[in-house]
Amino acid sequence: MAFTNEQMERYSRHIILQEVGVKGQKKLLNGKVLIIGAGGLGAPAAMYLAAAGVGTIGIVDADEVDLSNLQRQIIHGTADVGKAKVKSAKETMNAMNPDVTVNTYREFVTSENIMDLILSLIHI
């Protein structure tokens, strides 16, 4: 996989690091991460993972954005109030980095569905 000029510029700070380099950035772009919850911890994690160029990110959350969420769940904005958190998060992440594929799961995580959620991301 060759980087586009835009990707070279976007990921330049990773690429110049010996510990990451071109090889490491390619691993990130081919990486997959599942985030449980798009709230106080999941929201900033999702933004950083998208900005870093993690290629496929799954987000699981059954909740909707509430006005009281906005001071700490920075992935959501005022216009997102009432919207599913996974939809709001996906929109923000895609706007931030079009290289990232975001898969949403609007459901609660349970002991019965956790393996299916993980496997669905692995097999994408």
Feature locations, PLM:
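Adenine nucleotide-associated cytosolic modules
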Residues: 1-122
